[in-house]
Amino acid sequence: MIITMILIFVFGYLCIALEHKLRIDKAAIALLMCGALWTVLSLLGNDAQIGTQLIEQLGDTSEILFFLIGAMTIVELIDRHGGFHVITDHIKTRNKRKLLWLLSIITFFMSAVLDNMTTTIIMIMLLRRMISGQKERWIFASVIVIAANSGGAFSPIGDVTTIMLWMRGNVTSGLLVAKLFLPAPVSVIIPTAIACRYIPDENAHPEKLDTAPKLPPFVGPRFSHFVLVLGVGGLLFVPIFKAVTGLPPYLGMLISLGVLWVFTELVYDHKQNMEESIKNRVSKVLKHIDMPTILFFLGILMSVAALQSAGLLTDFADFLDKNVHEVYTIAGITGLLSAVIDNVPLVAACMGMYPVVDTAALASSLDPVYMQAFVQDGIFWHLLTFCAGVGGSLLIIGSAAGVVAMGLEKIEFGWYLRKITLLALAGYFAGMLVIFLEHLLLG
């Protein structure tokens, strides 16, 4: 059964990589792969609880999907009311290389507060207003993905995995930020500097794209500002809602969408002289949400969930612990794997394999030097946070931000592999080196 599931996953993965040549949408491949893996697990596995596991995994996946639908709808609503023009109008530089650096910096710090998916959606919408060439936009979007993943890695609320480690007590917020505040920017600076060589040193001349927002009559800058503030405020509300209530972030996102929905409905209801066909109501905007991306995400996450339910991830963690026994290598390999496999189950597997070591366990350990890495705020947890987050940038389907960018900009898997993977890899290892030097010099 295990071999069959691995073969199905590898074959499906290759088909997704060759999507452009096969001319089959990656969402269809992901859904078929998901169905095949769960079917094999059900027919050949001995677990009577497979139905229960499927429902549990679907519940976890649905949280992400509803979060994504809510975020994409809010961002699309802001865009259709010209809200992003408020931001782009304040970006004075039109030099493409300076623009690349500026968008990279904004993305990095924004993703430390917002989640990576939302940040990527917002920045790509901004990007479409400034860069008209598709291949150039792919380079910009790829750097945005790298910056979003790196920015999310050093903040306790910046990524799902950092939230997991923070809420479970593996790391504390202050030390996490302090230890990764240098490595995380380094992992962005190096790829951005290299990517600048792919961009001509000239001014951008954006054309009027089909995706440009069509503002209804009587909707002026004031309404655009209101929608922007309410939308971004709603996105910022999500991590606060999570921290205060302990409820899943998707619920906060749906609340934010509901508030914005009610606001726009009330405004349009007072525009009685406006034709209904030109009103950008949420019910109309929802028709433009990229559903193939949502379904692709569903297929990929549920495929990984099938591998997790089969015990493959736990078995691999056991293998690393027994045969490697070195924290930098274990965390480094985990990060490389996160480019292929969703980092959430990988981090969850590591947390299950390596519980936080308390003082008593450390004192009685036969190998206290090694076990010191697993205490609260130990070097392993900071490494794992960095590697699992930044490692997702190595492939376009390695992170939620990458999948969203792939869907929005139709970035080809092979193009990203050829043009961006080595850049991201350089930043990844440079960041690990900074962590090593920090630990060596500062402890």
Summary of predicted features, one role per range:
Residues 37-47, 58-59, 110-147, 151, ...:
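Membrane-interfacial helix-loop connectors
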Residues 5-77, 86-94, 250, 254-302, ...:
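Hydrophobic transmembrane alpha-helices of multi-pass solute/ion transporters
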Residues 81, 90, 103, 234, ...:
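Transmembrane helical segments that form the transport core of multi-pass membrane transport proteins
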Residues 8, 133-138, 142, 154-155, ...:
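Juxtamembrane and boundary regions of transmembrane helices in multi-pass small-molecule transporters
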Residues 162-173, 233-247, 436-443:
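Transmembrane helix-loop junctions at the membrane interface of multipass transporters and ion channels
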Residues 59-70, 175-191, 245-258, 330, ...:
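Alpha-helical transmembrane segments
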Residues 6-18, 33-42, 68-76, 107-108, ...:
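Hydrophobic core segments of alpha-helical transmembrane domains in multi-pass membrane transport
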Residues 6, 31-32, 65, 100-105, ...:
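Hydrophobic alpha-helical transmembrane segments
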